[in-house]
């Protein structure tokens, strides 16, 4: 039984913000912002990476049902290539907070830096394993992106995206060198860029 984080730590109108998908070679970076309702506990919240896929899927539905407000946002591959991954992630986090139906009094951002926001914000290193609202955001972002990568695997078969979700595994790198990049591969990432830079013999 996974106990998860103490729901008593939930504060009124504090948004947790997290991202998933900074490291993959393809697909969007996905962010989420969540304001939890202190009167509607969600048991078992934790860093999405520490939960089984089945548990994440169940919590995904429960968070969306019980949270005071939530928003899932993204930055597309084109934006990642144009802005760089850090700036694209900050933009996607900004979109998630701005998309909330309730304005938070504070946004707690997983990591060590904050996007430009109209509300006060603070970074929390390893926030997804400390702050329930950030843990909830990590679950929404991960489940959303994982589902999308399964769909993209059907559109671009042969790369194994449903399995590795775009991360640079041996299977992915081998397929990339054999099949070449797809339109959803990030041209600014070295393994993809190097393939495109190879001169034709």
Swiss-Prot record:
One of its GO terms (cellular component) is cytoplasm. Signal peptide: none annotated. Manganese or magnesium. Binds 1 divalent metal ion per monomer in the absence of substrate. May bind a second metal ion after substrate binding. A divalent metal cation binds at residues 18-19, 110. It is found in: Cytoplasm. One of its GO terms (molecular function) is RNA binding. It comes from the Bacteria. Its EC number is 3.1.26.4. It catalyses: Endonucleolytic cleavage to 5'-phosphomonoester. Residues 12-201 form the RNase H type-2 domain. Its main location: cytoplasm. One of its GO terms (biological process) is mismatch repair. Keywords: Cytoplasm, Endonuclease, Hydrolase, Manganese, Metal-binding, Nuclease. SUPFAM superfamilies: Ribonuclease H-like. InterPro entries: RNase_HII (IPR022898), RNase_HII/HIII (IPR001352), RNase_HII/HIII_dom (IPR024567), RNaseH-like_sf (IPR012337), RNaseH_sf (IPR036397). Its cofactor is Mn(2+); Mg(2+). Transmembrane segments: none annotated. Gene3D superfamilies: Ribonuclease H-like superfamily/Ribonuclease H. Belongs to the RNase HII family. PANTHER family: RIBONUCLEASE H2 SUBUNIT A (PTHR10954), RIBONUCLEASE HII (PTHR10954:SF18). Endonuclease that specifically degrades the RNA of RNA-DNA hybrids. This is Ribonuclease HII. It comes from Pseudomonas aeruginosa (strain UCBPP-PA14).
